[in-house]
Amino acid sequence: MSDFQLEILKKLDELDEIKSTLATFPQHGSQDVLSALNSLKAHNKLEFSKVDTVTYDLTKEGAQILNEGSYEIKLVKLIQELGQLQIKDVMSKLGPQVGKVGQARAFKNGWIAKNASNELELSAKLQNTDLNELTDETQSILAQIKNNSHLDSIDAKILNDLKKRKLIAQGKITDFNVTKGPEFSTDLTKLETDLTSDMVSTNAYKDLKFKPYNFNSQGVQISSGALHPLNKVREEFRQIFFSMGFTEMPSNQYVETGFWNFDALYVPQQHPARDLQDTFYIKDPLTADLPDDKTYMDNIKAVHEQGRFGSIGYRYNWKPEECQKLVLRTHSTAISARMLHDLAKDPKPTRLFSIDRVFRNEAVDATHLAEFHQVEGVLADYNITLGDLIKFMEEFFERMGVTGLRFKPTYNPYTEPSMEIFSWHEGLQKWVEIGNSGMFRPEMLESMGLPKDLRVLGWGLSLERPTMIKYKVQNIRELLGHKVSLDFIETNPAARLDEDLYE
């Protein structure tokens, strides 16, 4: 038994109840107290409860206001001294922080007004007031907080406002209330932690006391590799696709020609998506060869320039050299285009999917990265319709735990009709977009040589969005990139997409 544990038992024997360990043992920190109490509780010597008290301390700025007065009082006194004050001169005379906050709060309190000359002057209610008798509420409340006096009487809104203004900082004091346990005494017998063969053979265990198992304690963390959350969710998606009869497409070609990334998908060469601000172009090498399929190339040229297969085209001069430029693929539909072109050699119903990285030259923020993962599914069959697409989307997302979908018409260059897919998000209490879908255009499919009655459904969604929702990640940079915490990777649980993903 430690000296501190013995001190606690003696004080408890003297008082019957220790109402505040903070007051009784001020020289010991809360962690030392908690450790000693837990040890004594394991011996049934005592019981204790934790009491947390919220505290507030003045920041450097708050202490300055306490000593010098609030910004609004400084402004009012300056206006009284000068008579009037040009608004443009407030910042230069008082500084940007004092001027901005002081003006706002003085107007709010009704202490100042703006005249016809765009000057600040004292309001009517302060015209004949001695400013020394004017109550500086901000300063008074800060003094009250510093003295820890009647904090319960301060309105919560006022405290929140002071915190937002960074005039006070919230803290916490941990205290404990201690009472006697069922086996209380000031003597402490050491508890055995292991049952040995000698104890059993000599029956010595009958006279010993053993430390009870603590089933609530954390085990030692095993040092081992761990799967990234994106890999876990990716594997869930793969299993959903496999269970629905899909085959995975090869997706390891990150660099594509503009032909497969844009032209084969019926995206015109003047489309904004092909601009430098949206697409990463490869510097070395700059270009690559085009497909050897001359009929296919002629069809693409014709369908862009004057139209074919029921289309009037885009009516522009299509340039083969534009197709040869190398880019980091902006979507995984480039993979689908290659696979569908191969399918044209032996047309038949098929189901394909891919999950891999794509790249966009766009601003990075909490929900967008220049590099992310796209989940894409492609289903080809004879004489299927938009109704089949809707039904299939409902079945696909139901396996992810997402039901009650809504579909909204949208525009994609390579699908028509096209639909955005929305689901109700219980946490956000609103409909959120979870995917994009459509039927690939005849201009794209028939150019490849696919028969007219073989139609293709396609849809895609981000891998990051469901992962962020599942793991409650607010900033995508904490999920992917150099800011990811290794502790987060090692401790996150497995993901099951069929368990209320969007709730």
UniProtKB/Swiss-Prot annotation:
Q: Could you say which residues bind Mg(2+) here?
A: 416
Q: Name one GO molecular function term.
A: magnesium ion binding
Q: Name one GO cellular component term.
A: cytoplasm
Q: Where is this region: Contains the major tRNA-Phe binding sites?
A: 2-173
Q: Which reaction does it catalyse?
A: tRNA(Phe) + L-phenylalanine + ATP = L-phenylalanyl-tRNA(Phe) + AMP + diphosphate + H(+)
Q: Where in the cell is it found?
A: Cytoplasm
List the EC numbers from the record.
6.1.1.20
Query: So which cofactors does this thing need?
Result: Mg(2+)
Q: Does the keyword Acetylation apply?
A: yes
Q: Which NCBIfam families match?
A: pheS, PRK04172.1
The record's PANTHER family line, in alphabetical order, gives: PHENYLALANINE--TRNA LIGASE ALPHA SUBUNIT (PTHR11538:SF40), PHENYLALANYL-TRNA SYNTHETASE (PTHR11538)
This protein's assembly is summarised as: Tetramer of two alpha and two beta subunits.
Q: What is this protein called?
A: Phenylalanine--tRNA ligase alpha subunit
Instruction: Please tell me the species this chain comes from.
Output: Saccharomyces cerevisiae (strain ATCC 204508 / S288c) (Baker's yeast)
Its taxonomic path starts at:
Eukaryota, Fungi, Dikarya, Ascomycota, Saccharomycotina
